[in-house]
C-alpha cells in the first residue's frame, strides 16, 4: 500500500494520473449536467408556453439528451466550398476546450479544485476573454457573410461586457484581498457579497448573459436576421461542440456568480439543519437555480436590438460599475476594512 502511495504522490507519472482523475471527476458530471440542461431548458420553455415539452424518449423525456447526442454523432460533417478547412474544424474545438479548462480552478468545496491557484479569478477572466476567438475564427473560416456578421457582433458584444465584468471582479477583490477563489468564498462566511453588493451582482449576471450570447442578448445568432450567426455553416459534431461549449460557459457564469456573490458551497445560514448538507450539494443547487434564471429569461424577455445592447453595456453598466467600484474602495478605506494582501 505504501508503494502505491509513493508511486502516486512522489513520481511525475503518478501525479499526472491523479490530475487526470481529478479532471475526469469534474468533466464527466459537467458533461452530464450540460446534456440534461438542454432537456431542462426545453421543459422550462414548454411550461412557460403552456406546453409539455420532450416527453417521448424515456420516462418524462429524460433520455432525450442521449437521443440528441446520437443524432449528432450519426450526421455528416459538411465543410462548405471556399472555407478554410483547418480553421473551420479548429474553431469549435477551441471553443469547447476553453469552456472545459476554465473549470480547473473552480472549487466545489473547501480546497476541492483541480488547480487551487492564487490567481484563480484572473485565470477565469482570461479564459472567458479568449472564448471570443473561437467565434471569430468560425465566422471568418466559414466563408459566409451571415457567419462573418455574427462573428463581428460577437467580438463587439463580448469586449463591451467584459469591461463591466472586470470592474465587478475588482470590487470583489478589494473586499477579499486575494485572487484565490477559495479565499473569496471563505470571506463570505458571515455575509454573502450579494447583500452589500446587490447592484454589482445584477450587473455581473446580466453581463454573463451577454458574454454567453444568451437571450435577450443573442443577437450573435439572431434567427430572424442572420440565421444562426457564426454557426450557420456547421453541422454534426462540430455544431455539437459549439453547443456544448455554450452550455458549459453558461454553467461557468452561474458558478462564478455563486462563488463571487452567493457564498459558493456555504449554506445560507450556519445553523444545524443547513450545515448538515454537504458543501458540493449547496454549490450545485445554487448553480442550478441560476441556470433556471437563464432559461426563464429566454422564455420571457424579447431580444435587444444591437444598438440597445451596446448602449446598455457602455452607457449604463460601465459607468455604474466604475462608480460602485470607487464607492466600495472609499467605504473600505474610511472604515478601515481594507484587507491585508498576503
Swiss-Prot record:
It is found in: Cell inner membrane. The keyword Translocase applies. Its EC number is 7.1.1.-. InterPro entries: NADH_UbQ_OxRdtase_su1/FPO (IPR001694), NADH_UbQ_OxRdtase_su1_CS (IPR018086). It is a multi-pass membrane protein. It is an enzyme of class 7 (translocase). The chain crosses the membrane at residues 15-35, 86-106, 119-139, 159-179, 190-210, 251-271, 277-297, 316-336. Its main location: membrane. Signal peptide: none annotated. One of its GO terms (cellular component) is plasma membrane. It catalyses: a quinone + NADH + 5 H(+)(in) = a quinol + NAD(+) + 4 H(+)(out). The keyword Nucleotidyltransferase does not apply. Keywords: Cell inner membrane, Cell membrane, Membrane, NAD, Quinone, Translocase, Transmembrane, Transmembrane helix, Ubiquinone. One of its GO terms (biological process) is aerobic respiration. GO terms for molecular function: NADH dehydrogenase activity; oxidoreductase activity, acting on NAD(P)H, quinone or similar compound as acceptor; quinone binding. PANTHER family: NADH DEHYDROGENASE SUBUNIT 1, NADH-UBIQUINONE OXIDOREDUCTASE CHAIN 1. NDH-1 is composed of 14 different subunits. Subunits NuoA, H, J, K, L, M, N constitute the membrane sector of the complex. Belongs to the complex I subunit 1 family. NDH-1 shuttles electrons from NADH, via FMN and iron-sulfur (Fe-S) centers, to quinones in the respiratory chain. The immediate electron acceptor for the enzyme in this species is believed to be ubiquinone. Couples the redox reaction to proton translocation (for every two electrons transferred, four hydrogen ions are translocated across the cytoplasmic membrane), and thus conserves the redox energy in a proton gradient. This subunit may bind ubiquinone. This is NADH-quinone oxidoreductase subunit H. It comes from Granulibacter bethesdensis (strain ATCC BAA-1260 / CGDNIH1). The gene is nuoH.
Amino acid at each position: 500500500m505504501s508503494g502505491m502511495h509513493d508511486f502516486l504522490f512522489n513520481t511525475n507519472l503518478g501525479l499526472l494520473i491523479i490530475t487526470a482523475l481529478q479532471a475526469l471527476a469534474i468533466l464527466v458530471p459537467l458533461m452530464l449536467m450540460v446534456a440534461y440542461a438542454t432537456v431542462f431548458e426545453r421543459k422550462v420553455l414548454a411550461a412557460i408556453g403552456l406546453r409539455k415539452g420532450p416527453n417521448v424518449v424515456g420516462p418524462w423525456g429524460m433520455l432525450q439528451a442521449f437521443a440528441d447526442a446520437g443524432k449528432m454523432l450519426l450526421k455528416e460533417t459538411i465543410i462548405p466550398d471556399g472555407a478554410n478547412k483547418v480553421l473551420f474544424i479548429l474553431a469549435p474545438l477551441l471553443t469547447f476546450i476553453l469552456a472545459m479548462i476554465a473549470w480547473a480552478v473552480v472549487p466545489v468545496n473547501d480546497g476541492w479544485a483541480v488547480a487551487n491557484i492564487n490567481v484563480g479569478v484572473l485565470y477565469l477572466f482570461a479564459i472567458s476573454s479568449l472564448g471570443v476567438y473561437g467565434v471569430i475564427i468560425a465566422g471568418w473560416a466559414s466563408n459566409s457573410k451571415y457567419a462573418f456578421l455574427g462573428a463581428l457582433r460577437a467580438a463587439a458584444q463580448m469586449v463591451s461586457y467584459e469591461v463591466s465584468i472586470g470592474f465587478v471582479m475588482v470590487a470583489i477583490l478589494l473586499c477579499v484581498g486575494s485572487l484565490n477563489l477559495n479565499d473569496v468564498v471563505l470571506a463570505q462566511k458571515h455575509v454573502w457579497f450579494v447583500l452589500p453588493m446587490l447592484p454589482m451582482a445584477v450587473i455581473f449576471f446580466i453581463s454573463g448573459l451577454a458574454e454567453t450570447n444568451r437571450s435577450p442578448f443573442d443577437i450573435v445568432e439572431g434567427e430572424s436576421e442572420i440565421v444562426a450567426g457564426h454557426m450557420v455553416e456547421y453541422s454534426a459534431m462540430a455544431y455539437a461542440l459549439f453547443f456544448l461549449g455554450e452550455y458549459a460557459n453558461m454553467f461557468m457564469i452561474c458558478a462564478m456568480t455563486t462563488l463571487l456573490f452567493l457564498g459558493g458551497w456555504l449554506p445560507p445560514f450556519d445553523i444545524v439543519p443547513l450545515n448538515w448538507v454537504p458543501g458540493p450539494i449547496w454549490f450545485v443547487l445554487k448553480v442550478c437555480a441560476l441556470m433556471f434564471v437563464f432559461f426563464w429569461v429566454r422564455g420571457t424577455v424579447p431580444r435587444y436590438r444591437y444598438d440597445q445592447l451596446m448602449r446598455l453595456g457602455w452607457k449604463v453598466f460601465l459607468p455604474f460599475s466604475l462608480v460602485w467600484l470607487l464607492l466600495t474602495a472609499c467605504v473600505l478605506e474610511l472604515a478601515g476594512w481594507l484587507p491585508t494582501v498576503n
